[in-house]
């Protein structure tokens, strides 16, 4: 199935799986999704992920979700920049999520990274989504 917005699809799959207390969820594979998942893993929002190659040539990413005391670690995950309305931020205007308790994930010229990494690298970019 073709999707017009792979980031929104990924976010929705994660949110829906956590509402149903699933331990794993799968999504079609792509480099962009892997980069986003790498940021979520390094920030401690997911346990991990693995790419699975099928005999048909398609790849799929299996995401292992993270829970703490039976509650999902991700309380809120919300898309900011959408295909119809892109949202960009310079280093000075990078949003803080819940007073710094959450993160914004950005697509920058130096790759996909969390907001604090973008501040350290002194780059701005497209604000893909926020996580708390």
From Swiss-Prot:
One of its GO terms (cellular component) is cytosolic small ribosomal subunit. Keywords: Ribonucleoprotein, Ribosomal protein, RNA-binding, rRNA-binding. GO terms for biological process: translation. The keyword Ribonucleoprotein applies. Coiled coil: none annotated. It holds the Pfam family Ribosomal_S8. InterPro entries: Ribosomal_uS8, Ribosomal_uS8_CS, Ribosomal_uS8_sf. The keyword RNA-binding applies. GO terms for molecular function: rRNA binding; structural constituent of ribosome. PANTHER family: 40S RIBOSOMAL PROTEIN S15A. Part of the 30S ribosomal subunit. Contacts proteins S5 and S12. Belongs to the universal ribosomal protein uS8 family. One of the primary rRNA binding proteins, it binds directly to 16S rRNA central domain where it helps coordinate assembly of the platform of the 30S subunit. This is Small ribosomal subunit protein uS8. It comes from Bradyrhizobium diazoefficiens (strain JCM 10833 / BCRC 13528 / IAM 13628 / NBRC 14792 / USDA 110).
């Amino acid at each position: 199935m073709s999707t017009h917005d792979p980031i929104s699809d990924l976010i929705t799959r994660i949110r829906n799986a956590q509402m149903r207390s699933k331990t794993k969820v799968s999504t079609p594979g792509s480099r962009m999704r892997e980069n986003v998942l790498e940021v979520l893993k390094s920030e401690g929002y997911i346990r991990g992920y693995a790419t699975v190659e099928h005999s048909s040539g398609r790849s799929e990413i299996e995401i292992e979700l993270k829970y703490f005391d039976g509650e999902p670690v991700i309380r809120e995950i919300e898309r900011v920049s959408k295909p119809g309305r892109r949202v960009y931020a310079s280093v000075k205007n990078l949003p803080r999520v819940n007073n710094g308790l959450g993160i914004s994930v950005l697509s920058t010229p130096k790759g996909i990274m969390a907001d604090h990494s973008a501040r350290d690298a002194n780059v701005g970019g497209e604000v893909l989504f926020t996580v708390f």
